[in-house]
């Protein structure tokens, strides 16, 4: 007989890979797409690889054009996205209530990432890969696909799981080494996504 365990009044799920997602509203996706193409507030830059004490461009590792967006930026596109993201997070926490053992929030900038045809985050990696505060205190990771890419998406190594890039789909997962992942490179079309992390309050 399985033991029934609850936390904060929520039933805890014993069998899961802790990778879960849901769709955000199409109007919010359109807003983010418009923001990427038309905003003139922030500068784009080539995607970088971060290691302890260093950052560099390596297109064999990550080939992208990135736009870092402070969560404090007061524009409707970002505000509306954060509201929708909170709804997806609430559903995630209903399924995995132990994820609430520590308090967390978005502190780092959001990252809008544009991948050209044949581009992507090509190497296996984790979101907690070095000793910088932004890495050490990452608790959960989120990503929203902003266009359909039938031969693109994300795959996780240990879970042997693939999530296709579907417009508006927002996926959340743990940040640590257990969830090594990489992008599935499309040879047919470009890809636009938004990524970020929830950081433990210990970083504050």
Region spans (language model):
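Catalytic core of non-heme Fe(II) oxygenases with the double-stranded beta-helix
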Residues: 82-204
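Non-heme Fe(II)/2-oxoglutarate
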Residues: 2-103
């Amino acid at each position: 007989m399985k033991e029934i365990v609850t936390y904060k009044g929520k039933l805890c799920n014993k069998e899961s890979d802790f990778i879960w997602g849901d769709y955000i509203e199409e109007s919010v996706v359109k807003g983010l797409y418009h923001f990427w193409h038309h905003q003139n507030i922030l500068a784009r830059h080539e995607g970088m690889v971060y290691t302890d004490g260093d950052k560099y461009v390596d297109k064999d590792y990550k080939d992208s054009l990135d736009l870092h967006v402070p969560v404090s930026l007061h524009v409707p596109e970002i505000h509306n996205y954060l509201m929708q993201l909170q709804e997806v997070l609430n559903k995630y926490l209903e399924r995995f209530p132990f994820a609430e053992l520590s308090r967390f929030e978005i502190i780092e900038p959001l990252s809008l990432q544009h991948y050209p045809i044949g581009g992507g985050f090509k190497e296996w990696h984790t979101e907690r890969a070095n000793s910088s505060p932004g890495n050490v205190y990452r608790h959960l990771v989120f990503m929203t696909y902003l266009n359909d890419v039938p031969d693109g998406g994300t795959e996780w190594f240990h879970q042997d799981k693939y999530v296709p890039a579907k417009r508006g789909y927002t996926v959340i997962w743990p940040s640590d080494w257990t969830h090594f992942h990489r992008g599935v490179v499309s040879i047919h079309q470009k890809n636009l996504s938004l990524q970020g992390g929830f950081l433990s309050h210990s970083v504050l």
